Amino acid sequence: MSKAGTWIKMFVVGTVICVGGPALVQAIRPTDEELFKRYNPELQRRSLEEGDRRAQEFDDYVNKLKQWSKSDKSIWVAAQEQQEQMRTQAAVQRSQAKDEAKAQREEMRKELLGEK
């Protein structure tokens, strides 16, 4: 066979592989609806219940990414700063709750002892 024939044959084989492979995968891959129908009823129910919550969490995450990307800093640095801010706020809230509980206990103790 001539060199031109070999080149043509290799071009045809390459095209079949490059086009046929993804086409085959697309043809045999089940759709989301087909996969959902294969679930047992309990998984279907749980998936339907949690679907909205997961979609909302994903939307929140995407919005956070958009917010972080507007910053001059790297997304990872901005995310880390926000996590640190959240930790600080949580620590402040815990300390406030602890102080309120302590004040409430002190007030209850005073009421029990009749000091009020």
UniProtKB/Swiss-Prot annotation:
Keywords: Chaperone, Coiled coil, Membrane, Mitochondrion, Mitochondrion inner membrane, Transmembrane, Transmembrane helix. Residues 96-116 have a biased composition (Basic and acidic residues). The chain crosses the membrane at residues 7-29. It is found in: Mitochondrion inner membrane. GO terms for cellular component: mitochondrial inner membrane. Residues 87-116 are annotated as: Disordered. Its main location: mitochondrion. It is a single-pass membrane protein. InterPro entries: Cbp4. The keyword Metal-binding does not apply. Residues 78-116 form a coiled coil. GO terms for biological process: mitochondrial respiratory chain complex III assembly. Essential for the assembly of ubiquinol-cytochrome c reductase. It has a direct effect on the correct occurrence of the Rieske protein, core 4, core 5 and apocytochrome b. Belongs to the CBP4 family. This is Assembly factor cbp4. It comes from Aspergillus oryzae (strain ATCC 42149 / RIB 40) (Yellow koji mold). The gene is cbp4.
